[in-house]
Structure formats: C-alpha cells, structure tokens
C-alpha cells in the first residue's frame, strides 16, 4: 500500500470513528438504548473509563502509555519494513486507526465513548475503534500464523 493511500485511509478510519461518537453523543442520552437493527444491534451511549470492552476501569495513565508504545512501534515497523504484504499493512492500519480513535477520546474526555451493543449475545458495549483494533489484531495473528506455517 502506498504511503499516501495508507495515510488517507488512516485519516478516514479515524474520522469515521470520531464522527460515530459525535453522532451518538448528539442523538442518544447517556445510558439510553435505541434499536438499530432490532434483535441484532442496539446503540447505547456509554462512557468507558477502561479499555476495549470495558476492562481495566480507571487506568487512564496506563492506556496512554500503552497506546503510545503500540502505535509508535506499529509505525516504526511499517517504516522499517517497506515491503510488507497487503494483509499485514491492513492489520497495522486497523490497529493504528483504532488506537488513535480511542486515544483522542482519552485525551479529550478522559474516557472512551462506546455505543455498539450486540443484542443477540451477552457482550460488552464497544465502539468503531474497538472494532478496528479487534479485526486488526485477528488479521495480524492470522498473518503471523501463516508465516509460521510457511517457515518465514
């Protein structure tokens, strides 16, 4: 992926995350639940003082340090490995985008705005950035697993 496309994609993904959070705050009261796709997904405005899926509540300094380290390492890795396959680049793009999206909330608000609730299962309320992070990590694990299978 070309550097310009990567940066543009990063900006668009972070903007989508931030716009979704802005919309939730503007249209749904704190704690209110609104069906989005009935029986499947509801939107609920929640202020999360923890990490993805509400773990490690009230550890803001920890998340700031970890986020800076992970994003910094991912950017360093991309810069020092210019010929990564597209899947690894996509995985790192999602991880960086998700990290930045939640980092903006932590710096600006001291909490992260969550809003997506899966009605069909007992699961934590999460946000778009959490989705990026989750998919990015899963994709990266698959890439690394495949490399191991091929002896790389």
Curated annotation (Swiss-Prot):
Annotated active site residues, numbered on this chain, are 114, 130
Instruction: Please give the start and end residues of each transmembrane region.
Output: 5-25, 61-81, 84-104, 125-145
Its catalytic activity?
A: Release of signal peptides from bacterial membrane prolipoproteins. Hydrolyzes -Xaa-Yaa-Zaa-|-(S,diacylglyceryl)Cys-, in which Xaa is hydrophobic (preferably Leu), and Yaa (Ala or Ser) and Zaa (Gly or Ala) have small, neutral side chains
The protein in question is named Lipoprotein signal peptidase
Instruction: Look up the record and name the pathway of this protein.
Output: Protein modification; lipoprotein biosynthesis (signal peptide cleavage)
EC code(s) of this entry: 3.4.23.36
Q: Mostly located where?
A: membrane
Pfam families linked: Peptidase_A8 (PF01252)
| Membrane topology summary | Multi-pass membrane protein
Its annotated function is as follows: This protein specifically catalyzes the removal of signal peptides from prolipoproteins.
GO function term, MF aspect, one: aspartic-type endopeptidase activity
Q: Which organism is it from?
A: Streptococcus pyogenes serotype M2 (strain MGAS10270)
Disulfide bond sites:
none
What EC class does the entry list?
Answer: hydrolase
The reply to whether Transmembrane figures as a keyword in the UniProt entry is yes
UniProt keyword annotation of Electron transport present: no
Name one cellular component (GO) term.
Answer: plasma membrane
Tell me where in or outside the cell this protein is found: Cell membrane
Q: Which UniProt keywords apply?
A: Aspartyl protease, Cell membrane, Hydrolase, Membrane, Protease, Transmembrane, Transmembrane helix
Q: At the top level of its lineage, which domain of life is listed?
A: Bacteria
Q: Example GO biological process term?
A: proteolysis
Please state which protein family the record places this protein in. Answer: Belongs to the peptidase A8 family.
